[in-house]
Amino acid sequence: YEDTEHMVYAWAATGEKNVSIQAIYNQVFSGSLYHGKEKTVDLPSGASSGTLLNRLLMKENPVAGTVTIRLTKEENGVTFYQDYVTRFDRTLTLKDMTAQCDGAAAALEKEDGTKGFTPGVKTYSVTVSMAAQNLELFLSRYEENACYGEEDVGYRIRVDGTDVTAEGGVVIPLDGTINTQTVTVTVENNKAPDGTGTYTLNILKSPPVEVTFETEPVDALLHLRDVLTGVQQLPDNAGNYLLCEGSSYSYALTKYGYEAVSGTLTVTRDDAGALVISNGTETYPVTETEGGGAVTIVWTLNPAASNPAIDPYIPAQWADFRGSSTNNGVTDVLLPTAAQDGTLYWANQLGVGFDSDAVGSPILVDGDIITYAGDKIYRVDTVSGEVKVKANMDHKSSFSITPPVYADGMVFVALSGGTVQAFNAATLESLWIYTDKLGGQPNCPLKVKNGYLYTGFWNSETGNANFVCLSITDEDPAQSKESKCASWYYTSKGGFYWAGAYVADDFLLVGTDDGGNGYTSQTSRLLLLNPATGELLDSWDGLNADIRSTVVYDAGTDAYYFTSKGGTFYSVQVTGDRKLTNKWSVNLANGVGGVPMSTSTPVVYNGRAYIGVSGAGQFTPYSGHNITVIDVGARRIAYRVETQGYPQTSGLLTTAYEQESGCVYVYFFDNMTPGKLRVLRDRAGQTTPDYVTTEGGRTTAYALFTPTGDQAQYAICSPIADEYGTVYFKNDSARLMAYGSAIERLEITQQPAKTAYAEGETFDPAGMVVTAVYANGKTRDVTAYVTYKTDPLDGGDGEFAISFPYVMYHNEENGTEMTSGVETMVPAVTLNLTVGDGLLGDVNGDGKVDQADAQMILDYEAKRLDTELSLKAADVSGDGVIDSSDAVLILQYAAGTLKEFPAAAPKETEDSGSTDQIAVGDTGLPKE
C-alpha cells in the first residue's frame, strides 16, 4: 500500500455452512480513543461489496497494519477456527516536488508527457537552458498525521544520498554542457524499512538561443514570458535574452505614443530542420553554434494616430488619489479649521449603497469633479453639485473605492474584473479598455508617470493577482473600446489591495497582501520594481500582514513611508543603485487591545507622520480608534487622539496657517456612521492633542463637520480640496458632497448694464458680477449660480435680492461639545433698481439717453438682439412701434436738438396746429 492510501476493504467467502468470518486488528489513530485498541469486524461470507477495516492504516503515515481473518465454526460443543494473517507494508512517497531554474519556475514532465508532480509517479524530466547555472529542487514530506504517542511522522528525504530533510530541498549545480544530468531522490521512514520510495529526475539541456532585440524606438518596453511556466524572461547584462528550443514565449512591445504589438514567439525547427524563431507571421533564422545559436530580431512600432478630440493641456487641480506625484496629501489651501467657519454646500446622490453601485471617490479636473457610480462616469460642477456631463462606462466597479486618475487629457477608471477604462477628459467618451487575464477587484489607486499607468488587482486573500503597467496612449482613435495590452505585469499571491505605488523615473515601490487569511501573517512584502520592465530589483520581506496603504515619499527626510494591516508603520530609503536601505518601523497602538490595524496612507510633513489606526473592534464605536502622530526623527509615537470610528483612509494636511501659528491642520474621516470630518492641530514637538471635542464624555479629535440625516454614513474616502478651501468627498450614502469655508458675504462687484426698469419688465443680469467672499478670505465669481426674482418687476423691487442657494448645514461649538446639523443661512446681497414708468428713451436701462440706446433699437430692428425691448422706453415717437425712427429721435435728443420726445408731448386734437416734421434721412444733428 502507498502511504497515501489508507482505506482497506475485506471480502471473504467459504463454502461451508455455519462458519462466521471476522477481521481482527489493532487500530492506529492520532488520539488515545482508538489507538492500539483491538477491533473486530464481521465479514459476511460472499458479500458483493467489501467491508471497510476502519483505522487499520493511516493516511500519510507508513505505520504497518496486521489483520487476522478468522473463520470460526462450532460443532458438537467444539469451536474450530482457522486464522489467515495479512501484513500491510507501506511504500513511501513524497508529498510534493517542484523545481526552479535560476529563480524561475521549471515544469516537471512525466514520461507520458503530462506536467506536474504526482506522488505515485517516480520518473520525471525537466528541461532547462544549457546556460542555466542551477536547478533548485523543493521537496516536501508528510508531517501532519502522527500516530498517538509519536512526536514525528518520521519521513526523511535524501538527494543523491545526502539527507536534505531539514532544508526541504537542494540546489543542484548545472554543468553548462548539453549532457543530461540525473538526480535521485529517495524518501525513507524507519516504520517502512523496505518501502523506500525512489524518484528519478532527468535534467535535460536545451541549448540557448541568444536573441538580440533591436527596437524602434529604442526605449520601447519589451515584456517576454515563458508560456508554459509564466515566468518573465529578463535580458542578461549585455541586453540579450536566452531562449530555449522547444519553448514558446508571449511578448508585448509597447511605447507611450505608439501602437503596441503582441503575440507569441516559438523557438522551433522548420521543415528543413533549421532552428528558427517564429511569431506566426515572421520567421527569424537562427545562426546555430555548438553552444546553441544567435539571432537578431528587429521590430519597429508605428506612431499612434493623433486623436484631435483629446486636449492634453487640460489642467487638473487634484489629478489622482493623493493629488501629488509623491502621494503625500499636503496642500497649502485655507481649509476651515473651526466648525462655525464652514458649511456643507451640497450633497448629490449619484449612486446607490456602498458596493458596485456606489459613488466613487472624486478628483478635480479643469475646475470640475470627475467621479463615477454604477456604470456611469460623471463630470460634476464644484459649486452647485449638478451633473454637467454623464457617459456610460463598459461596466461597474467593485466597490467604487478607487478614485479616477487624470493625465494628458484623459481620465482612467478602474472597473471590476481587473479592468481599466480610459475616457476623454473633456467629453467622457471612451477611448480604450484593459482587462487583466487574472481579473480581480480594482481596489488599488491608479498612478500615471511618464505616459504609463500603474495599478494592482485583488482576487482573494490567498489568490494570485497582478500589478500592471499600461501605456495610456489612445492607439486607435477610430475605436472607442479597443483592447489594451499590458506593457508588463507582476504576479503576487494575495494580490494588491488599496496598495498604491510610488513611481519614480527609474523605480517604483508597492506593497503586497500577505497571501494568507486574516491579518497576522508575516509574509507581506514591499516590492522595488523597475517601472519599465517590472523586474524585481529588491524587496523588504516578512512584513506585518497586508500592506493596504499607498507608499508615500517625503522630501524632507528623503524616505518612503507606508502602514500595514498588522499594525506597523514603516520607513525605508532607496539607494542610488536601486536597493532598499535604512529600514525601520514603529508598532502602532490603540490603548485597548486587539490588532491596531492601519490601512491609512501616511501624510508626512516636517518630521511628523499622521495616520488612522483601528481600535479593538473595527466597527465598534470608541473602541480605541485614533489618529496617531509619529515622531519620525525619534521613531516613536508622539501621541494619539481618539475618534468614534476607524479613520481607515488617508489624511489631508494644510500648511496654510503654519507661518501665522506654527501649526498644521490634518483632516480625516471616521469610517463609521455618521462619518465625521475631523481635524487635528499639530506642531513640531507636540506630545498631546490640543484641539478636541467632547463626545459622550470622551475626548476626541475636533469634529469639524458631521453629516446628518440621509447624508450620514460610513466614509471610506480620503478628502481632497480645491483652491477655495472646499473639501470634496463621498460616503456610503452614495452621495458626493462638498464642505468648505463658509460664504461670509456676497458682493456685487460689477453692476448690471440695466438698473432702471418699467413696471412689468423682468430683471436682466447682463453685465452683473456677483462675488462670494469666503470666511477664509478667498473670493469667487458666483454670478452663474445666484438666484433672483424672475417674475415681472413692480414698485416693491427697488431693493432687489440676489442670493446663493447652495448651502445646507454645519456644526456649531457648544462648549467643548459639538452641535451638528445647524442650518446655514443663505448668503444674499441687495441690488438697487429703479422700477417705475421708466425714463423715456433709456432703452438699455442705464439711466441715460444716449447713442447706445439708439444703437440698441437699430440692433433690435435688424433682429440682432435676443431680448425684447420695453415699448414704454423705446417707443419715443409714440406710434406704437419700435423702429429706426425711434433711434433717430434718440440721437437728436442726445445731441440737444430735440427737447422733448413726441411720445412725451401732450396729446393734440385734430384741429390743433401741426408739429415740426423731420424729413426722412434728416437726423436733426448739426450739418457740417
Label every model-predicted segment.
Residues 1-211, 216-219, 256-261, 301-306, ...:
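Beta-rich interaction/scaffold domains
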Residues 36-41, 256-303:
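Structured interaction patches on ligand/partner-binding surfaces of diverse proteins
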Residues 201-204, 300-304, 731-742, 831-835, ...:
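A recurrent domain-boundary module in secreted/ectodomain proteins
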Residues 307-359, 363-401, 405-742:
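Extracytoplasmic/lumenal domain signature
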Residues 834-928:
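Cellulosome-associated attachment modules in secreted, modular CAZymes
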Residues 225-239:
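Short, acidic Ser/Thr/Gly-rich low-complexity loop/linker segments typical of extracellular
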Residues 245-246, 759:
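Surface-exposed loops/turns
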